[in-house]
Amino acid sequence: MYRIITEETVAGDKAVTSHYLKIIYEAIIKAGKECAFGWIDGAPKSDTLIFDECKVALKYRLRGYRNTVVWVQGIVPEEAIMKGYSRWRYYAHSIIESLVLKKCKLVIFCSQEMRKHYEKKYQLKFDKYFVMPCFNENEVDQRAFENSEKYEKNNYVYIGGLQPWQCFGETLQVYKKIEENSANPVNLYVYTAEIETAKKEIQKAKIKNFHIEYKVKEELGECLNKIKYGFVLRANVEVNRVATPTKLSNYISHGIIPIYSDCLKSFDQYNKDSNGPRIGLQCGRFGVRNERNFEIK
């Protein structure tokens, strides 16, 4: 018996996490195995437990459950440092990761770069693993190519949160240069739950033409169909080198050309291999250098 256990509580993250865990659930059912969401007291120690966090997996391992599978969404210790937490949290999370990953029956990674990161950091060799990039759309919306605004206007978009590693400030600097040098009118659309924070940053950057809204997943697709270019800029740090940002699937599904940093290694390599259309900005090479190794000419 397989059991999927999550303790995610943040609304936005919970929705995305549920999407991925549902895919794992359906794969197990299609394989002819029994699977259920959630925990029940007295579950046999022989059950295989699937987690989306190492710290949760460790709790159950300490209770005697040895058949564990972990889906690793991000490198938590390094993310903690980027969020400004103390070094002790980094070391605590690293110890948890090391203990859990060494004993897992299977590890699900977001990218091959993430697997390489863990193998190097903890001197591990994963024999049983699976790579499932982060995404929330897996088919092309043909309506996007029938939207005249996509071809007639130069609309740019940024979607998602404003965490430090998402480089929203640097994105605005790049867009400002585009706005100043474009021979034709340009528009920036920002879809985020952090509307007031985004508005302050945009006004600080003195962007002229912009629109800020929050859209749920079901509404976002229609809004993206009119967009031509989408930003996914990242600082050249390990958190980003192992990442496969969800917004890339949104962009590709709606015919949007990604403007992305080449430090998103897995996506960059895939795009090169498939000869896909791209505007790749080399980290550290795109005149105003800041503390996160960006240059914006």
Q: What are the residue ranges of the model-derived segments?
A:
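Glycosyltransferase donor-sugar binding loop
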Residues: 159, 186-199
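Active-site proximal beta-strand in glycosyltransferases
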Residues: 48-50, 63-81
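Acidic anion/phosphate-binding donor-loop and adjacent secondary structure
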Residues: 80-81, 130-153, 167
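Conserved donor-binding/catalytic core segment of Leloir-type glycosyltransferases
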Residues: 147-166, 171-175, 188-189
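Nucleotide-sugar-dependent
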Residues: 166, 217-223, 228-253, 259-270
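Nucleotide-activated donor-binding/catalytic signature segment of Leloir-type glycosyltransferases, i.e.
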Residues: 192, 198-229
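Membrane-proximal helix-turn-helix segments that form the acceptor-binding/catalytic region
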Residues: 76, 87-109
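Donor nucleotide-sugar binding/catalytic pocket of nucleotide-sugar-dependent glycosyltransferases
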Residues: 102-120, 124-143
